[in-house]
């Protein structure tokens, strides 16, 4: 079944209840272009998340260099928390894309937009570490 651009953005608006969902890649001319745009945005968000996670680990190591055990404990806690957060993000995005047929463009677009949004929220938290 082919989903029109209008259907995808209507679906995303209802699912995400966010202006962000309709703004991201909304100027693309076709369903395929919307998908490619959200895929690109997702990759950028994933790269930014990974870079900030690495930077947070470096800040912790630097801030706690006088106490290696404390630094190791903090880093271990961050690693475990990040793993849990990734599970949360993936589950939340699965919920948000649930009504679209799995494997469809609409499902992939909804998932990509969700990942971008939630990654941006996580970036803000990671930038504050160490607290």
What are these model-predicted stretches?
Residues 14-18:
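N-terminal signal peptide c-region/cleavage motif recognized by signal peptidases
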């Amino acid at each position: 079944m082919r989903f029109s651009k209008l259907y995808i953005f209507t679906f995303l608006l209802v699912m995400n209840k966010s202006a962000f969902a309709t703004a991201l890649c909304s100027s693309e001319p076709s369903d395929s272009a919307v998908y490619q745009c959200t895929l690109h945005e997702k990759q950028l968000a994933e790269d930014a998340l990974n870079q900030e996670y690495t930077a947070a680990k470096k800040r912790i190591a630097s801030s706690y260099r006088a106490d290696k055990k404390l630094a190791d404990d903090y880093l271990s806690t961050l690693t475990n928390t990040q793993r849990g957060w990734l599970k949360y993000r993936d589950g939340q995005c699965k919920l948000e894309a649930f009504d679209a047929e799995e494997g469809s463009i609409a499902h992939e677009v909804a998932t990509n937009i969700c990942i971008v949004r939630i990654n941006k929220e996580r970036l803000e938290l990671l930038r504050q570490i160490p607290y």
